[in-house]
């Protein structure tokens, strides 16, 4: 037995229904209305464009008429080659100023404290400390200062104070 052909058509896929004249006319009117609406809304340039396109998060909408503020050269500009400036040497400080800088150097103080605490420094740090201490010695000799003079003066003052005390004012 053959299955009936009428049953197979109805179960497979339904036949597309033809639209009536009224439905076709309504769709034509809708298409015509949409065609008239194409393009930008009137006044969109001055008003700042479409306000529903995510301007909710911005406080002030950006004016589309305002462009870049970078100046544009109007004529042919000559290429300017930059001349490399020679690196200027460090400004020469007076020996007194250089000595003050070295004495107040935080890195030098920290490394000297580590040395006094008994820590061993790396070769690079040790050489840096040696260079700085040598420079301090040179500057003190130039200025006529020495650590020994300060200690001797303090000892002299202590001896004078002792003598005054022994004499009994």
UniProtKB/Swiss-Prot annotation:
Residues 1-99, 146-169 are annotated as: Disordered. Pfam families: YihI. One of its GO terms (molecular function) is GTPase activator activity. GO terms for biological process: ribosome biogenesis. Residues 49-58 have a biased composition (Polar residues). InterPro entries: YihI. Residues 147-159 have a biased composition (Acidic residues). A GTPase-activating protein (GAP) that modifies Der/EngA GTPase function. May play a role in ribosome biogenesis. Interacts with Der. This is Der GTPase-activating protein YihI. It comes from Escherichia coli O81 (strain ED1a). The gene is yihI.
């Amino acid at each position: 037995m053959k299955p009936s052909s009428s049953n197979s058509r109805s179960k497979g896929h339904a036949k597309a229904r033809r639209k009536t004249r009224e439905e076709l006319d309504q769709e034509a009117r809708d298409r015509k209305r949409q065609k008239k609406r194409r393009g930008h809304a009137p006044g969109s340039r001055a008003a700042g464009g479409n306000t529903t396109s995510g301007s909710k998060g911005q406080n002030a909408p950006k004016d589309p008429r305002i462009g870049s503020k970078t100046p544009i050269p109007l004529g042919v500009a000559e290429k300017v080659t930059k001349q490399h400036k020679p690196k200027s040497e460090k400004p020469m400080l007076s020996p007194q100023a250089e000595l003050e800088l070295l004495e107040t150097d935080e890195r030098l103080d920290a490394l000297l404290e580590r040395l006094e605490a008994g820590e061993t420094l790396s070769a690079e740090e040790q050489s840096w400390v040696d260079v700085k201490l040598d420079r301090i010695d040179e500057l003190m000799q130039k200025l006529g200062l020495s650590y020994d003079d300060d200690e001797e003066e303090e000892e002299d003052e202590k001896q004078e104070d002792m003598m005054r005390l022994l004499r009994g004012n």
